[in-house]
Amino acid sequence: MEIKRIGIAGAGTMGYSMADIFASYGFDVTLWNHRKPTLERAKTLISETSRDKIHYTTNLEDIAHLDIVIENVTEDMAIKEGFYESFCKMADADMILATKYIRSFHQCPGPICDAQGTLFRDALVQSADAYSPY
């Protein structure tokens, strides 16, 4: 699978930074957040060269049919669980869904998302130099 369309769920520091970097490398990026003021703030913090290359949305459906979505939703478990409950019902079955971190992962009452695939926790990143703009 070739990754061309990337969704970022959550427009906080980690989310808008990822969107900025992916857009600077030419990917089609959609940045989603459940709160419009957070998206507006993210727009002001993303580099000018990337800002207009990113689609900003509060509509969850806009990221449900992309190649990969990276979840960066706030660590408020009620909000995070609400995101997964809604998103997993509409996401394409062959989409890659990744998460940066779930603080209380071990305390989750059950599966986060009924999906095919493998969850790699504590994955080792051998080298990110090829992807870093710095």
Tell where the protein language model's regions lie, with residue ranges.
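Short glycine/serine/threonine-rich phosphate/pyrophosphate-binding segments
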Residues: 16-17, 78-81, 104-106
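A generic structural signal for alpha->beta connector loops
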Residues: 26, 51-53, 94, 116-119
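Rossmann-like NAD(P)-binding element
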Residues: 34-41, 48-97
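Rossmann-fold dinucleotide-binding core
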Residues: 98-134
